[in-house]
């Protein structure tokens, strides 16, 4: 079976690294200002207002659940208490794992390829719809398995924590059925935000209306599931309108096999990051996880705003990916993002006692110390998020992501084993901090290595030999 064009250049590294050109210059915007294949004219530099606007749109669109959660978390904390919030933390961490397992963690890589596929006018629809069909088959099959497992779990009445894990896996998996990756790849952040805002508002209304009447952590996750339905439907309506129906899946096995490095690395990162509560639920009680979750929700809300910078810059980075100015632009953007993260970390540290008391109430006073430890991860998570979202996908360096994830996982495993002995939630937080610092350090070193390699390759390109005219005597 011949592989499709969109897979023809794939390597065992999942997606090929984009090579730098052998001569100065780069992608240029067409003289008429339209988007499309490179044309004549000088390279058009996006204004700061355009970049900030895209960041704001992605912040609310892609990570809106955090913003809505911050608005509703006082209600959740006071209705469910520390024990209920701990169970919800288990479900929400499983939500992120389920989302990752369904979409294979390759949405950023696929988004980075959308401009490339759309530039090939003759085969654009055929390639895009084949990719959509193969990707849908994988996601739909996995989400269905989660749904069956959830139904069986409720039928046999498994323990409450296990129910929350399976419910979270299914809710996260359903969310990953959306075609939002296409919108991000096309740079249509306003459209993405509009569609997702519908779901966020539905979640807010459902939570406020149902949770006080049915004070149960299951209800909070079910509200999130129901609110995902209109967003998923709208993204599919948009994709169908622009590209038509997805093609019959033919190469899903190839996509699965070659997505393994990215999937494994993302799963490892999620395991010691957003999915930590699911893993630590085996050694910590729900109350301890509830205290941890209180501070973690605030930290993740801020982190989501910082993560959005990388997503907003991804299409621009992809357009800059084939000229030497890419690394200078990347370094400047990373430095600014880390500075913002450091400022946010310091602000949260100072305001921790007031925030915990205001948002969660006096029952969660013990969360203050945990919050002050966890806010220190923000600069590190910002480094990792920016490099793995806006730089490595453009350079198609999946091995760098995998190695970083392995390093973080080794540290997290050590912290988990230590937690078995200490039975202290502080061990969880310190382990998370050390893991994030380790991974961020690795990615900075990896970024430096790739930049030096690309510059070395560009510097060693031989100049063309121009024959001299012979002078006759």
Task: Map each language-model feature to its residues.
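Signature of the first transmembrane helix
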Residues: 3-5, 11-17, 21-35, 47-107, ...
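Interhelical loop/hinge segments that connect adjacent transmembrane helices in multipass membrane
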Residues: 31-47, 51, 193, 217-224, ...
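Membrane-water interface segments that mark the loop-to-transmembrane alpha-helix transition
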Residues: 54-69, 91, 100-155, 324-345, ...
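Transmembrane helix-bundle signature of multi-pass secondary active exporters and lipid flippases
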Residues: 92-100, 292-311, 344, 374-381
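Interfacial segments at transmembrane-helix termini and the short loops linking adjacent helices
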Residues: 154-170, 350-383, 426
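Hydrophobic alpha-helical transmembrane segments
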Residues: 162-172, 193-242, 407-411, 425-449
């Amino acid at each position: 079976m011949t592989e499709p064009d969109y897979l023809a250049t794939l390597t065992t590294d999942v997606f090929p690294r984009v090579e730098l050109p052998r001569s100065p210059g780069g992608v240029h915007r067409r003289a008429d200002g339209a988007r499309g294949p490179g044309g004549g004219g000088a390279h058009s530099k996006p204004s700061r207002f355009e970049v900030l606007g895209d960041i704001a749109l992605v912040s609310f669109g892609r990570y809106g659940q955090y913003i809505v959660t911050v608005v509703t978390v006082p209600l959740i904390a006071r209705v469910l208490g520390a024990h209920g919030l701990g169970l919800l933390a288990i479900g929400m961490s499983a939500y992120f794992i389920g989302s990752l397992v369904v979409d294979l963690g390759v949405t950023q890589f696929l988004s980075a390829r959308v401009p490339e596929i759309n530039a090939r006018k003759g085969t654009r629809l055929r390639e895009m719809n084949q990719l959509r069909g193969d990707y849908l088959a994988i996601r739909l099959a996995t989400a269905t398995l989660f749904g069956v497992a959830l139904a069986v779990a409720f039928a046999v009445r498994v323990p409450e924590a296990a129910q929350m894990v399976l419910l979270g896996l299914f809710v996260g998996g359903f969310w990953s059925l959306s075609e939002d990756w296409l919108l991000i790849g096309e740079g249509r952040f306003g459209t993405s935000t509009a569609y997702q805002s519908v779901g966020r508002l539905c979640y807010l209304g459902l939570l406020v209306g149902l949770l006080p009447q049915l004070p149960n952590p299951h209800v909070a996750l079910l509200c999130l599931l129901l609110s995902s339905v209109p967003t998923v439907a709208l993204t599919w309506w948009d994709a169908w309108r622009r590209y038509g129906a997805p093609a019959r899946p033919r190469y899903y096995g190839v996509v699965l096999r070659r997505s393994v490095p990215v999937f494994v690395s993302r799963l490892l990162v999620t395991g010691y990051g957003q999915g930590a509560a699911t893993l630590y639920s085996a050694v910590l009680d729900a109350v301890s996880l509830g205290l941890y979750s209180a501070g973690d929700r605030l930290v993740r809300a801020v982190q989501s705003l910082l993560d959005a910078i990388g997503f907003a810059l991804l299409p621009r980075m992809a357009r800059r990916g084939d000229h030497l100015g890419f690394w200078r632009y990347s370094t400047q953007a990373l430095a600014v993002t880390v500075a913002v993260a450091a400022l946010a970390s310091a602000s949260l540290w100072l305001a921790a006692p007031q925030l915990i008391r205001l948002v969660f109430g006096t029952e969660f006073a013990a969360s203050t110390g945990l919050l002050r430890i966890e806010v220190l991860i923000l600069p590190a998570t910002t480094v990792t998020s920016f490099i793995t979202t806006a730089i490595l996908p453009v350079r198609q360096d999946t091995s760098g992501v995998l190695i970083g994830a392995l390093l973080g996982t080794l540290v997290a495993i050590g912290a988990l084993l230590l937690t078995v002995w200490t039975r202290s939630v502080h061990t969880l937080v310190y382990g998370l901090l050390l893991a994030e610092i380790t991974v961020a350090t690795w990615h900075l070193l990896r970024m430096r290595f790739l930049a030096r390699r690309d510059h070395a390759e560009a510097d060693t390109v031989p100049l063309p030999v121009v024959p001299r005219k012979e002078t006759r005597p």
